[in-house]
Regions:
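Structural recognition of the beta-strand scaffold that forms the well-ordered cores
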Residues: 1-2, 50-52, 85-88, 116-119, ...
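N-terminal catalytic or cofactor-binding beta/alpha core of small enzyme domains
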Residues: 1-84, 93-99, 191, 201-206
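Solvent-exposed loop/turn segments at secondary-structure junctions
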Residues: 5-8, 56-60, 91-96, 122-125, ...
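A short, glycine/acidic-enriched catalytic loop
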Residues: 17-23, 94-130
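Loop/turn elements at helix/coil->beta-strand transitions in domains of secreted/extracellular proteins
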Residues: 45-49, 81-85, 113-114, 151-152, ...
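Alpha-helical scaffolding within the catalytic cores
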Residues: 73, 98-105, 157-162
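Active-site-adjacent substrate-binding region
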Residues: 130-157
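Active-site-adjacent mobile loop/cap segments within catalytic or ligand-binding domains
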Residues: 153-206
Length: 206
């Protein structure tokens, strides 16, 4: 799923889109939802059963997007009690003084964006059980990817906020690239991530 589904990338080549806002578009051919399509296909190939929620939760209002996506997670858990892992796929935003930066993983074939895993904790004082278990899941995925592609992953980030991760025992936020990356760089990165992390995630849900 995508709490901020309109997150998009730097237009390049044929990937030109009508922007809804700065580096945002509701066109799912060009925003993070398209990257999610690639991840869903890659994880399915790793023999994981995948339900890809392509709903745009951050338009027309960005405010309240986590409340809306959280309500959707609850509905999915009621409908599919065996649901084990919920991935909220985003792209990062790295900028300073109006300069937009990109993340780069130098690979033998071609450069792509980097990927970051984000894990919420209970540091805010809000209810968030099993966050350490989610950290272990992130570490397992991170180790699997770094073994295959040492430069693909950014360090795991721990944050005080829950970002709806308290709703399941297997939640992950994945940030693919940043607003300075192109869509092609992001899709290349998420495919490599899924190919390497997919088997590790599959073992966790068995």
């Amino acid at each position: 799923m995508h709490t901020h589904a309109s997150e998009a990338f730097t237009p390049a080549g044929r990937d030109l889109y009508p922007a809804s806002d700065t580096c945002r578009t509701e066109d799912t051919n060009y925003n993070i939802v398209h990257v999610g399509d690639v991840l869903a296909d890659t994880l399915t190939a790793a023999r994981l059963q995948v339900l890809h929620d392509r709903t745009i939760y951050d338009y027309p209002s960005y405010t309240g997007s986590y409340n809306r996506s959280g309500a959707a997670v609850q509905e999915y858990l009621n409908q599919y009690p065996s649901l084990r892992i919920v991935i909220d796929l985003h792209r990062d935003a790295l900028c300073s003084d109006s300069v937009v930066y990109k993340t780069v993983a130098e690979l033998p074939d071609a450069a792509c964006s980097q990927v970051m895993l984000l894990v919420g904790t209970n540091a805010s004082g809000l209810y968030h059980p099993y966050w350490e278990e989610k950290l272990r899941t992130a570490v397992s995925a991170q180790d699997a990817v770094k073994t295959a592609h040492p430069t693909l992953m950014r360090p795991i980030t721990l944050v005080n906020e829950r970002y709806n991760q308290h709703l399941t025992r297997g939640s992950l936020i994945i940030e693919v690239g940043s607003s300075g990356n192109t869509l092609q760089e992001a899709t290349r990165a998420v495919r490599l991530f899924g190919e390497s992390a997919g088997p590790a995630l599959a073992r966790l849900v068995q």
